[in-house]
């Protein structure tokens, strides 16, 4: 590997660390997931969605009705953000770690990381466990992975 390639890898690693720090802040430091008046067990039950596409379906219904601009904006930001914010991870993981260039290994790694994030958000009450977030995050990472490989082949 030549000197320019090593510099690009090093720059990618630095960007990845900054990206991870920003994502940790977004995922764990913005707002708590707790609901006043509920004990811990009730909090857990209130902050979990295990039904695939339940939240997505509800958000899409709001988007189609266009009844409340604030709620509409929240739905669009949530759906789009859960995809768009994870595209960089899909680009950077295979760029930095060659073993992550295999799609199945990449997908398993990303699914494991996102599952851990969702579980931590739930049990720390710093968010919720929403299977739809996991699905949308993985879609974003997969789009980044595809983009990485398409761009890499054109070189």
Where are these regions (language model features)?
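Bulky hydrophobic segments
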Residues: 1-126, 131, 145-155
């Amino acid at each position: 590997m030549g000197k320019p390639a090593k510099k690009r890898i090093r720059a990618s690693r630095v960007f990845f660390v900054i990206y991870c720090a920003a994502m940790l802040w977004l995922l764990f430091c913005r707002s708590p997931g707790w609901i006043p008046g509920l004990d811990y067990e009730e909090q857990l039950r209130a902050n979990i969605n295990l039904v695939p596409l339940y939240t997505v379906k509800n958000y899409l219904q709001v988007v189609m009705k266009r009844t409340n601009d604030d709620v509409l904006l929240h739905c669009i930001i949530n759906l789009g953000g859960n995809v768009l914010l994870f595209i960089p991870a899909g680009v950077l993981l295979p760029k930095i770690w060659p073993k992550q260039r295999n799609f199945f290994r990449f997908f398993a790694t990303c699914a494991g990381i996102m599952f851990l994030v969702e579980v931590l958000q739930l049990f720390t009450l710093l968010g919720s466990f929403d299977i739809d977030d996991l699905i949308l995050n993985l879609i974003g990472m997969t789009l980044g992975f595809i983009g990485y490989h398409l761009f890499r082949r054109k070189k």
